[in-house]
UniProtKB/Swiss-Prot annotation:
HAMAP family: CinA_B. Belongs to the CinA family. NCBIfam families: cinA_nterm, PncC_domain, PRK00549.1. Gene3D superfamilies: 3.30.70.2860, CinA-like (3.90.950.20), MoaB/Mog-like domain (3.40.980.10). InterPro entries: CinA, CinA-like_C, CinA_C, CinA_KH, Competence-induced_CinA, MoaB/Mog-like_dom_sf, MoaB/Mog_dom. The lineage of its organism: Bacteria, Bacillati, Bacillota, Clostridia, Eubacteriales. This is CinA-like protein.
Amino acid sequence: MKTACLISTGTELLLGTTNDSNSVFLATRLLERGIKVIGKTVVGDSRETIKMAFASSLGLADMVISSGGLGPTRDDLTKEVACQVMGCEMVINQAEVKRLEDFFARRQRPMPESNLKQALFPAEAEIIFNPLGTAPGMYLKKDNKVLILLPGPPREMEYMFKNEIETRLERDFPQALNRVTRKTIKILGPGESQLEKILDGVIDDSPELSMALLAVDGEIHIKLTADGQDINHSKELMEKACQSIKEALGRNIVGYDNDTLLSVVAACLANTGKKIAVAESCTGGLLAKMITDLSGSSEYFWGSVTSYSNEAKMLYLNVKRETLEQYGAVSPEVAREMAQGMQKQSGTDLALSITGIAGPDGGTKDKPVGLVYICLADGGFLQVKEMHFVGNRESIRILAAKTALDLLRRHLKNGG
């Protein structure tokens, strides 16, 4: 697999006043094309640190892609320093001078003399046209290395990468780009450490297959990349790995690639023809919001009750006063009565209820912040799940709602 290092230049990136979205975009696009990013560096507008970054990156990877530092001002040093490291002499490119002059003429503005530095390039470099700004990019192949320089503004950088750089990568690295396959497996249930233990030894240790675990909003995404001798070999490696993971994780697998927990639950409900209603306390309507985020949810979603107070639980869900007084609002007993009451009020096949303590206040030694009870009712069947979530108020609410959806998914997948 071909490798790349990314360099982002700009003091504003180091100070944290600007997010480095360019590196995220580039790493994603490169991996999709079978090029592995093995390093990323963020440097300020300092000649020495920029020089060290390019020297180090060129020593590590097959290609180096830089964004930023191609403007006309004194602190725009990227191109000059990178070309010094590559041992290339820069000369004025008259075609670029003409383009810059036309750019300013169309805007009825005189071209500052400082902009001429943007027309300096090594004679052997391919100049990358920038229709959205004054800073052109550069693509240079030398000594089995590729140097790519792109402007810092994300809109300009992304346009140039998609329309100019990717065609050159396909030209220069056709074998790398055409033999890689990728798959994302989405998991809910085991945590990252537990999942790593489960998967230990499941996939053969091979340089042709890589696996990474990524935590995403309560889920764990397993990112698989197969880089075999050719595309067929890569597909075989991927199929074998996916089958091994499926056997190890079973129902913990929510879906693959573009699948979402909600889309999988929606498909299960559509297949069974069942309708659902939800009763929420600590999530404050978030579960209902998640369900209705998907177009067409009226086919299977009856509605919801947000019963935040004890009075609302009694009035709208028929939760008994004695149950609340004896066990408290956050209890498996109340979760059951909420689900049963919601099912009775709506007449639906299924009902979900959530009651808990999202924090930051309200917790006790016996019932700490993060304690949540979720109940699923299906006819006479009742299942209560006790969860202990860790995080702030928002994350606890999100985890509670997603766990409720996952409880429903597992029930429907098991024939419920």
